[in-house]
Each structure stands twice: as structure tokens, then as C-alpha cells.
């Protein structure tokens, strides 16, 4: 599970935010993908900053990672490919990208689409960012309509119900910098 650090002046608030973060991480199955979560609650202002230091996200999945071309033939000016699927995990993503002529079994696909084994079928990094953004939405209190998000090695979002001040944005950027300077073991 990710290390969770909550900065909040109110002791009860700190406990509640910690529990909300733990629950959201568990619900979205993110706990093992994140090294550290840091939450700054300035309830009197009010603004909130949530920072996430993810483990290295997975690379993009290419066709060659889960399929191979077992046959190709030319028919009527088009090349017909028969693919053997070695791992079904990413097959639904492939089926959205190609024209399927036939699928004799769940491990075989026949297509007349241009096939390149290096074509990107699924971007795990984008899916991960979407999950982190969902996580952040679950943690921030309701009514926080103004949000700025910064994404690099760390992901930091600042939220408020009013326009953000420069010093608040600077605090969010400092948290992002702090998280990015941590090594993967979680130490500075």
C-alpha cells in the first residue's frame, strides 16, 4: 500500500482524510501502483493539494506483446492476416482498432486491416492517469470547482471553491518538486 501523509490542522480531519484516501486507493486498486500520497488540507482558506508519486507506469502495449501473425495472403488487392492471440488481456483493445473479417476462436482473428506488430494497442500510462484523476476527484471535498493539475513524474492537483492565489499554486508546485525528488524507495 502507498505511504499516506496528510497535513491538516484538525486532528479528526486528518484521520478522516487518511481514511478517505485509503478507501479511494483500495476502490480503484491503485495502492500497489503508488509510492506515496501527500494531502495538504487548508480548510480555513479553503484549498486542498493532493500529490501522488506513482511507481514507474507500464509501457504501451504493442501487438507483438500478445499476438503473432501466423498467416498472410493477398486477396483482391488486400492483404488478409490471420493472428494467433497468445494473451487475451488486450484483445478487446485490438478489436476496437481493426476490421475483423472472422474470429474462428478466441485465440484467432482474421483481418484485412494493415497489421504492424509494433502498433500500439493499449496505453497503460493513459489509463493509469485517468485512474489517478478519478482518485483525486474522490478525495477532494465537494464544491472544489477550481482545479489545476500538474503531471510529470509526480501528479499534483490543487483544488478550491474560489480562484487560486499565486502562493497556493506555488505550494502545489513545491509538493510536486518534493515528490519528484524522492527516489523509488520513498526517501528524499
From Swiss-Prot:
It holds the Pfam family DUF2113. InterPro entries: Methan_mark_17 (IPR016762). NCBIfam families: methan_mark_17 (TIGR03291). This is Uncharacterized protein MJ0802.
Amino acid at each position: 500500500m502507498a505511504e499516506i501523509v496528510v497535513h491538516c490542522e484538525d486532528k479528526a480531519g486528518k484521520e478522516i482524510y487518511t481514511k478517505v484516501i485509503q478507501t479511494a486507493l483500495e476502490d480503484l486498486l491503485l495502492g500497489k501502483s503508488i509510492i506515496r500520497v501527500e494531502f495538504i488540507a487548508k480548510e480555513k482558506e479553503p484549498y486542498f493539494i493532493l500529490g501522488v508519486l506513482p511507481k514507474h507506469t507500464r509501457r504501451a502495449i504493442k501487438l507483438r506483446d500478445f499476438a503473432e501473425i501466423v498467416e498472410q495472403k493477398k486477396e483482391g488487392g488486400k492483404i488478409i492476416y490471420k493472428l494467433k492471440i497468445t494473451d487475451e488481456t488486450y484483445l478487446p483493445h485490438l478489436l476496437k482498432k481493426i476490421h475483423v473479417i472472422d474470429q474462428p476462436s478466441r485465440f484467432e482473428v482474421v483481418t484485412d486491416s494493415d497489421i504492424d506488430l509494433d502498433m500500439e494497442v493499449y496505453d497503460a500510462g493513459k489509463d493509469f492517469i485517468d485512474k489517478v484523476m478519478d482518485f483525486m476527484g474522490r478525495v477532494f471535498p465537494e464544491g472544489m470547482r477550481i482545479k489545476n493539475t500538474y503531471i510529470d513524474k509526480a501528479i499534483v492537483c490543487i483544488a478550491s471553491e474560489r480562484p487560486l492565489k499565486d502562493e497556493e499554486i506555488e505550494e502545489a508546485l513545491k509538493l510536486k518538486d518534493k515528490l519528484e525528488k524522492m527516489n523509488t524507495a520513498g526517501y528524499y
